[in-house]
C-alpha cells in the first residue's frame, strides 16, 4: 500500500478542509494510505477510527506563513511539515502534500527529502489553464531557484515533459522556452544557451514563447528561470482575481439591466470559469526530489485539495521518481 504524508496543519483552512478532501478521495484510491501529521486531538475529532487507510502522527508545532523557512525547519523539528518530510526521507511515506509555508516546504523538500543524484536543482511546477482546452500547460520553475544555469532549465524541461506525458496524458508534449521574443536569437546569454540546449535535445521543442501567448495553449510545457517564472505566475493569478472582481462588480452593482445581462450570460460565464479553474489540475510539484512533494495553495478548499490528492496518486502510479533517478543518475 502506498503511503501519502499529509501536513494536516498547513494552510488557512487546516485541518478541516484537508481532512474533508482526503475522506472524499479515499474510496477512489484503495491502494493508498493517508498519514495525517498534526494536532492529534483535532485529527481524532475529524477522522474515522479503525480505518486501515488512515493513520495519525501527533505533532506539537506548526510552521506559520510568517516564519523564516530555513529557521523554521531547523527550530520547529516537531512541526507537522518537518515530521512529515522526515517520514518521507526515511521511507515510511512515499509522498508529501502540504498547504503550508511555500518557502519552508521547498526547504524541507530540498534539505530533508533530498534531491535526486544527478539533478542539479529541483524545479517548482504548477499546471496552469489555457483558453483553448481543458488540458492546461506546465510551467517550470516558478520560484524554487532565484538564479539559474542553462543545464538547470534543460533538466526541468526533461522532467516536466515526462510529467506532462505520464500524469497529464499528453502525447509528445510541446516544450517552449519563455523569452522576450519568438526569434531564436532573442534574450540574454542564458536564454540563448538554453535555446540551443533544447534545440539539440530529444524533446519536442517548439521554440520561444512570449508572455502574452502563455494562456493560448501553444505549448504543453513552458520552461523558464525561477525568478521570471515566479513573477509570471503571480501576474497570471493576480490578473485573474482582478478580472473576476471587476466582472462581479460590473454585473451586480450597475442596475437592473446589468443584473439581467448577468442572468442571460450565466451559462457562458460558468463555462469560462470552468475553463480557467486551475484547482482541477492539483498542486505545484517540486520535481527532482527523491520522493514527490506537492504544494497546494494555502487558501485552498476541500475541492482543490481533493485534486491534489488524486494528482499524487497518479504520480506514484506512474513511478515518476524512479524514472528520474534512472535517467539522471547515469
UniProtKB/Swiss-Prot annotation:
GO BP terms, alphabetized: fatty acid biosynthetic process; phospholipid biosynthetic process
Claim: Iron is one of the keywords in the record: no
Principal location: cytoplasm
Cell location: Cytoplasm
Enzyme class: transferase
Keywords: Cytoplasm, Lipid biosynthesis, Lipid metabolism, Phospholipid biosynthesis, Phospholipid metabolism, Transferase
Pfam families: FA_synthesis
Gene3D superfamilies given in the database record: Isopropylmalate Dehydrogenase
Record has rRNA processing as a keyword: no
Enzymatic reactions: a fatty acyl-[ACP] + phosphate = an acyl phosphate + holo-[ACP]
EC number(s) given by UniProt: 2.3.1.274
UniProt pathway annotation: Lipid metabolism; phospholipid metabolism
One GO CC annotation: cytoplasm
Family: Belongs to the PlsX family.
PANTHER family reported for this sequence: FATTY ACID/PHOSPHOLIPID SYNTHESIS PROTEIN PLSX, PHOSPHATE ACYLTRANSFERASE
Record function comment: Catalyzes the reversible formation of acyl-phosphate (acyl-PO(4)) from acyl-[acyl-carrier-protein] (acyl-ACP). This enzyme utilizes acyl-ACP as fatty acyl donor, but not acyl-CoA.
Quaternary state and interactors: Homodimer. Probably interacts with PlsY.
NCBIfam families assigned: plsX
Annotated protein name in UniProt: Phosphate acyltransferase
Encoding gene (name): plsX
Amino acid at each position: 500500500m502506498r503511503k501519502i504524508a499529509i501536513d494536516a496543519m498547513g494552510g488557512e483552512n487546516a485541518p478541516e478542509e484537508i481532512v474533508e478532501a482526503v475522506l472524499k478521495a479515499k474510496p477512489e484510491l484503495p491502494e493508498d494510505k493517508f498519514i495525517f501529521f498534526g494536532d492529534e486531538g483535532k485529527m481524532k475529532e475529524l477522522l474515522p477510527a479503525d480505518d486501515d487507510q488512515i493513520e495519525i502522527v501527533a505533532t506539537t508545532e506548526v510552521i506559520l506563513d510568517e516564519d523564516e523557512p530555513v529557521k523554521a525547519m531547523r527550530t520547529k523539528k516537531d512541526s507537522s511539515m518537518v515530521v512529515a518530510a522526515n517520514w518521507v526521507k526515511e521511507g515510511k511515506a512515499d509522498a508529501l502534500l502540504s498547504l503550508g509555508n511555500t518557502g519552508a516546504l521547498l526547504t524541507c523538500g530540498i534539505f530533508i527529502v533530498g534531491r535526486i543524484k544527478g539533478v542539479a536543482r529541483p524545479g517548482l511546477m504548477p499546471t496552469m489553464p489555457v483558453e483553448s482546452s481543458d488540458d492546461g500547460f506546465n510551467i517550470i520553475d516558478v520560484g524554487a531557484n532565484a538564479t539559474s544555469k542553462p543545464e538547470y532549465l534543460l533538466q526541468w524541461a526533461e522532467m516536466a515533459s515526462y510529467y506532462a506525458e505520464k500524469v497529464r496524458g499528453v502525447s509528445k508534449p510541446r516544450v517552449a522556452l519563455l523569452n522576450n521574443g519568438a526569434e531564436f536569437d532573442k534574450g540574454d546569454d542564458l536564454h540563448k544557451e538554453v535555446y540551443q540546449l533544447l534545440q539539440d535535445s530529444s524533446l519536442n521543442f517548439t521554440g520561444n514563447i512570449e508572455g502574452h501567448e502563455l494562456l493560448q495553449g501553444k505549448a504543453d510545457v513552458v520552461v523558464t528561470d525561477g525568478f521570471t517564472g515566479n513573477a509570471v505566475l503571480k501576474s497570471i493569478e493576480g490578473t485573474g482575481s482582478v478580472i473576476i472582481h471587476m466582472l462581479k462588480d460590473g454585473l451586480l452593482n450597475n442596475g437592473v439591466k446589468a443584473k439581467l445581462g448577468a442572468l442571460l450570460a450565466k451559462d457562458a460565464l460558468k463555462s469560462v470559469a470552468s475553463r480557467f479553474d486551475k484547482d482541477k489540475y492539483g498542486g505545484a510539484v517540486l520535481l527532482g526530489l527523491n520522493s514527490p512533494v506537492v504544494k497546494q495553495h494555502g487558501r485552498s478548499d476541500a475541492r482543490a485539495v481533493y485534486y491534489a490528492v488524486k494528482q499524487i496518486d497518479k504520480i506514484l502510479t506512474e513511478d515518476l521518481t524512479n524514472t528520474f533517478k534512472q535517467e539522471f543518475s547515469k
